[in-house]
């Protein structure tokens, strides 16, 4: 299970600075999808051998009113659901009443908390940090987030005990960043393994769009094999089921209601729960409320799915009972705001009455099959060559970028690794052209495609040419001849 780290503290103590530093390697993953709104409060990070979700709980001001009343409900929920809390303070400003108030709240929650004294650069850090021991939360860790000092050590201190307790294996940098090159036999075995596994389907959406209604509709129609077990507030419910001979695991982020409680319309929304579900899923089913249109929160959830590279199906719920004018407006808005994910199927359904629900599975299976389809190296290389023939790569410093060959680099999402010269200088416009070319040629539906470009190292770079024995003798005679002329 991927751990969750919550950054807590009053404003201007450096939470956003630390958040940006921790998530910088993941922040550009959705750059190829212009128009997408990203939620800057939640991110995925990898540091010191650990992959984790980091949450910036902005909005906690530390006042009594803020702690006791509605003060940033989502931030408080994030604290409750976090595995580790980093309580950030400002070493330059010293201990404040707001710090004391936040510390009191954290002590009452009995969360695993580490006190971080930030902004220690250029001051006597030991003296400045001494007063923070009075918070009663244990050792005080020094950090300068803007410069990166102490960040890696802090994550090690914070996550190692949790990882050991949960049996999480610490990874090396190369294990995460290395791009696996499959042989034909390995690719076939990996594809068969994925095809034999149940499809993990995460049903996500903002509050009250009908996630529970749809889940119960699916389970009611398909006779659930193992009915829902009570889950904790932070864990989604995993429900195995079978439909037309194919096995599924439904990941329900809303919590399946027993039939006596299906009428409830209020549900607790958890971004962290949704993030975890998306990370673990093969296919994401995003539900949008037809009567409210596309909200910023919908785009944020869409960003989570695209960040993770998951196959995607969109369901516009509550389609029944609205007049044709509203339907036309919703379809126009979908075309305008979701044009950048034209690979995803969109369905118009009524979870309450079951209209269109059965057709969802056709698109879910289609998306999963596209995401796990094996394509040979020869086929990928041929498509790459065809894309060059139709539209040549640009010139860089007077030389044409040369693409040599392509191969599969992974599944779910499909990854195509392209090797060549100067490929790092290819403009984004040409990369998007190639991505769309591969998608059309492979007839990929319901899943994004990732392209990765690798340059081959020049074996003669930084190496001097080795002379033969006769060349070496001639060089020495020439040197001695020049030396004799200089002495005369």
Swiss-Prot record:
SUPFAM superfamilies xref list: P-loop containing nucleoside triphosphate hydrolases (SSF52540)
Keywords annotated in UniProt: GTP-binding, Nucleotide-binding, Repeat, Ribosome biogenesis
Gene3D superfamilies noted in UniProt: 3.30.300.20, P-loop containing nucleotide triphosphate hydrolases
Pfam families documented for this protein: KH_dom-like (PF14714), MMR_HSR1 (PF01926)
Role summary: GTPase that plays an essential role in the late steps of ribosome biogenesis.
UniProt family annotation: Belongs to the TRAFAC class TrmE-Era-EngA-EngB-Septin-like GTPase superfamily. EngA (Der) GTPase family.
UniProt protein name: GTPase Der
Organism: Shewanella baltica (strain OS185)
Gene name in the database record: der
């Amino acid at each position: 299970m991927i751990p969750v780290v919550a950054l807590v503290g009053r404003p201007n103590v450096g939470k956003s600075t630390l958040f940006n530093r921790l998530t910088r390697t993941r922040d550009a993953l959705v750059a190829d999808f212009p128009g997408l709104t990203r939620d800057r409060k939640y991110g995925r990070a990898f540091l010191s051998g650990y992959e984790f979700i980091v949450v910036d709980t902005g909005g906690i001001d530390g006042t009594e009113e803020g702690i006791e009343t509605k003060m940033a409900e989502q931030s408080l929920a994030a604290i409750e659901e976090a595995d580790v809390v980093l309580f950030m303070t400002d070493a330059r400003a010293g201990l404040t009443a707001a710090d004391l108030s936040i510390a009191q709240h954290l002590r009452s929650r009995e969360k695993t908390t580490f006190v971080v004294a930030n902004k220690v650069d250029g001051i006597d850090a030991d003296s400045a940090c001494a007063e923070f021991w009075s918070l009663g939360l244990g050792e005080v860790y020094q950090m300068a987030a803007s410069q990166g000092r102490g960040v890696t050590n802090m994550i090690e201190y914070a996550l190692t005990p949790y990882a050991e307790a949960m049996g999480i294996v610490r990874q090396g940098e190369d294990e995460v960043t290395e791009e696996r090159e499959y042989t034909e036999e390995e690719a076939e075995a990996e594809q068969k393994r994925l095809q034999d596994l149940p499809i993990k389907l995460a049903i996500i959406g903002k509050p009250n769009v009908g996630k529970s209604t749809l889940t119960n509709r699916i389970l009611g129609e398909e006779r659930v094999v193992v009915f829902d077990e009570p889950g904790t507030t932070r864990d989604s419910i995993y429900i195995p089921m079978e439909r037309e001979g194919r096995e599924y695991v439904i990941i329900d982020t809303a919590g399946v209601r027993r039939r006596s409680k299906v009428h409830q319309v209020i549900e607790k929304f958890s971004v962290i729960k949704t993030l975890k579900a998306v990370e673990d899923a093969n296919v994401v089913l995003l539900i949008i409320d037809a009567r409210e249109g596309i909200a910023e929160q919908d785009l944020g959830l869409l960003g989570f799915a695209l960040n993770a590279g998951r196959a995607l199906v969109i369901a516009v719920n509550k389609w029944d009972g609205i007049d044709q004018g509203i339907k036309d407006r919703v379809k126009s808005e979908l075309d305008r705001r979701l044009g950048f994910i034209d690979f995803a199927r969109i369905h118009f359904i009524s979870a309450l009455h079951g209209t269109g629900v059965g057709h969802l599975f056709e698109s879910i299976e289609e998306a999963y099959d596209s995401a796990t389809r094996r394509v040979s190296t020869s086929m990928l290389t041929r498509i790459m060559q065809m894309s060059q023939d139709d539209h040549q790569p640009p010139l860089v410093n007077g030389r044409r970028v040369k693409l040599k060959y392509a191969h599969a680099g992974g599944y779910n999402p499909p990854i195509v690794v392209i090797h060549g010269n100067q490929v790092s200088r290819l403009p984004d416009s040409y990369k998007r052209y190639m991505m769309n070319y591969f998608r059309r040629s492979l007839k990929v539906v319901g899943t994004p495609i990732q392209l990765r470009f690798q340059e081959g190292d020049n074996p003669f770079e930084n190496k001097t040419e080795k002379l033969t024995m006769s060349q070496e003798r001639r060089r020495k005679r020439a040197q001695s001849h020049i030396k004799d002329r200089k002495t005369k």
